[in-house]
Amino acid sequence: MTGFPSIDLSLFDIGAPWRDQVAAQVDSAASSFGAFLLVGHGVDSSLTDSLLELGGKYVKRGSGAELPGFHDSVREYATSLTGLGHKLMAAMARGLRLDDGFFADHYTGNPRVSLRVGDYPVALSAGGQPDTDEAGNRRLLTILKLGDGARAQVKYDEGWLDVPALPGALLCTIGPVLQRLTDGHYRSLPRRLSRSVAGERPSLCFVFEPGMGAALTPLAGLRPRAAEVEAGYRQLRAGALLTQSDAT
């Protein structure tokens, strides 16, 4: 097993052969680890830092309290992450030997997106050890910015694998919907978040989903992991699949 993958997405905009190189890196990480770190992602660090700070205040005040500038920052950050989601899907399409716009044309032209701030409350257990919050990724992509003191792990073949701390990086994880679409070529693995200190953890969790009504037909010939993927996927529409996921 090699180290946890880190990908510089800024190279994707330079053009060939860098575009192909990044696409190959994304394809390898998504099919092996089901997750990867992103640097050079183009998300304004000052916007991220501001939202993390405001998110801490938001958690303390409660969701019903007014917080000047908070909702504007949320919308701006979500807009930036939506653009990042589209770029990632273009890189994945290229890595799968498809047109860059394949996913946008068929699934994500009008994506459903959501952003959660401080969505992983953690209390210290008896003895001072941090409790752990396990999360099953149920969407197309999830892009996480971890707050101070937070750490993430991905359940790999050999057990829980620590995601290294990399300043400014975002953690992207593959959701079951994308595993289905790629017929098991991409892996959707459990992840969990924990923290090393007490108090709130205003991590930012952005979810990128296919548009409602998009026909989720698995792509053929992508080397499915037969032992881990259920046989006989039937064609579903995004709304029906998300409803099923929410019920589990």
Predicted regions, residues:
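C-terminal flanking tails of non-heme Fe-dependent oxygenases
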Residues: 1-64, 70-248
